[in-house]
Amino acid sequence: LKTMAPSALRTSGRRRSKGVVAAVVVAGLALTGCTSTNTDDDSSLLQTLQERGSVTVGFAGEAPYSFMENGELTGATVALHREIFGNLGIETVEGVNADFGALIPGLQANRFDVVSAGMSILPERCEQAAFSEPEFNYTTALMVEEGNPMNLTDMQSVADSGARLATMTGAIESDYATELGIDSMQVATPQDGMDAVTSGRADVFALTGISLNWMKNNNPDAPVEVTQSFVAEINGVPQVGAGGTVFRTDDKDLLDAYNEELAKITSDPEKYLSIVGEFGFTEEELPDPELTTADLCAGAE
């Protein structure tokens, strides 16, 4: 693998019927109430969760990764967690909703056990938390007004055109904008980004292609379209995108056990697609086995 300076790189089965997703705690209650994780000095988090039989995940409501639908927590990362944690003897997945930018702080504050958001593995994030091995490859896309009147195709075209850009707070696209000198409008959720475009407050909303296409397909009457997905480039350097589950750095036993189960899924394309395919994921999103979390945390391509 070719290496580069960390600042140069920016990275944005069977279903277990007993892997029940339990009630979701609203963000306000979760942020002010008691913590979700209580371990004694002699027990690892893995042991505690196995004894409890449940794991609490932080999520930001970004479809199709982790979101609420008909009162239940669902999505590709949730499906992976049902499978993996179920195989570890942890049968129930509970969710705490939080803004994307509050997920790692919430994890550090013990408000949930792991983050289930398909979060991009970035060097600066690796300084704050531990990541699983990659679960998804990422590409970026743009949501624009129907007809794409500004002919926007990638992040550089947004910068060159002076288009008003919306990005989600804490998402990798915000970093792309900063590095390209774009003063982007920050939004809290994907829905807020689409609303910014449809209301005329923004010309374009940048997010992962899988998320934007999911939104468009589920809002067919919205007067927007989604560009072809692309790999963003900053100063001529392709920005390799891969995401994973986030853990506290102290929870190594849980992370190691999780990665062992994850490898059984990502090494088997048929199994991988049987878990995440219903959410619009294809073999294009299957992680490159040559690209590891260690590489991404170090800033290597």
Where are these regions (language model features)?
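Acidic, polar ligand-binding/catalytic clefts
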Residues: 82, 95-158
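Ligand-binding clefts/hinges and TM-proximal coupling segments of bilobed small-molecule sensing domains
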Residues: 36-40, 172-185, 256-301
